[in-house]
A protein has these predicted regions:
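Membrane-embedded alpha-helical bundles of multi-pass transporters/translocases
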Residues: 1-285
Length: 286
């Protein structure tokens, strides 16, 4: 069980400072924010208005549903062979990456006679997409959480205290901002391609251009617009060597502070609190 990390709660100014000088959190937040600007359409819109088979997802998702639990068992293997940075990127972008070949296959034949309208061909393509995606599902769920926890340890190492609350608020605001912009642009693009939601209800088909637009919005457009999120993570450098040094120093510091904190001496606690808040000022830039 982890000991109490700080005797005094950091001020708002100190909390903001701890986020600004926490490089791992900044990069992960920026990556998430840029990825959140992804513009795309709904898979269900494509199934309904292009393939005319709203329940196709129930069929294409069967193999992936079987693989899903086993994807968590594969995480240790991925950890041994790849860096956390690579796994974070691949876990976040694997869906878009796999949709690129789906788009290329669907484009065969053009807008009017393209395979993107063929339910059998696209059914197979979507099954492969969902199945391969599920292989990385465990990585997608576990690695970002691990890296977030490491970033909080980095915050403690760098500043002497942890600011999970302020960090969560900052990340949440960034994601909401990008989400609002993304939804607005997606709605605008649907209007641009002439998408009319009421046509399906009236039993009327969308035009070929609109159908292809819905297909592109579901496949290639999200991949293109979310790729910017990769750039910040290329500068993520909390690697094994730095983590080893960080945790070695943290363990020593925690042990010393725990000893002081359990002494029950008020003067010692005040001295400890002051020392914790001054760690960020004395720590060299990393």
């Amino acid at each position: 069980e982890r000991v109490m990390q700080s005797v005094e709660s950091p001020s708002v100014k100190a909390s903001i400072k701890s986020i600004i000088n926490n490089k791992p959190i900044l990069l992960m937040t920026l990556s998430s924010m840029l990825s959140g600007f992804a513009v795309g359409g709904s898979k269900q819109d494509y199934y309904i208005d292009v393939l005319n088979f709203a329940s196709l997802g129930l069929i294409t998702g069967i193999p992936g549903a079987i693989i899903n639990p086993f994807s968590y068992m594969a995480v240790p293997w991925f950890r041994r062979h790849f860096s956390s940075r690579f796994l974070y990127i691949i876990g976040d972008k694997i869906s878009g990456i796999l949709l690129v070949p789906v788009f290329l296959v669907g484009c065969i034949g053009g807008k009017k006679h393209g395979l993107y309208k063929n339910i059998w061909v696209m059914g197979i393509a979507m099954t492969l997409w969902e199945t391969i995606f599920m292989i990385f599902y465990g990585v997608r769920r576990i690695i970002p959480t691990e890296m977030y926890n490491e970033a909080m340890d980095y915050c403690e190492w760098k500043n002497g205290y942890r600011t999970e609350g302020m960090t969560s608020v900052a990340q949440g605001l960034a994601q909401k901002l990008s989400g609002i912009v993304s939804n607005y642009i997606s709605t605008w693009i649907k209007q641009l391609i002439g998408y009319d939601l009421t046509l399906y209800v009236r039993g009327t088909a969308q035009s070929d251009s609109t159908k292809f637009g819905l297909f592109a919005m579901f496949t290639i457009i999200p991949f293109i617009t979310t790729s910017l999120g990769i750039i910040p993570m290329l500068f993520y450098d909390l690697n094994d060597k730095k983590k080893e040094k960080m945790y070695e120093e943290l363990l020593e510091r925690r042990a010393a502070m725990s000893k002081e904190a359990t002494s029950g001496d008020l003067e010692a606690l005040e001295k400890l609190a002051k020392a914790q808040m001054e760690i960020g000022n004395s720590k060299s830039e990393l």
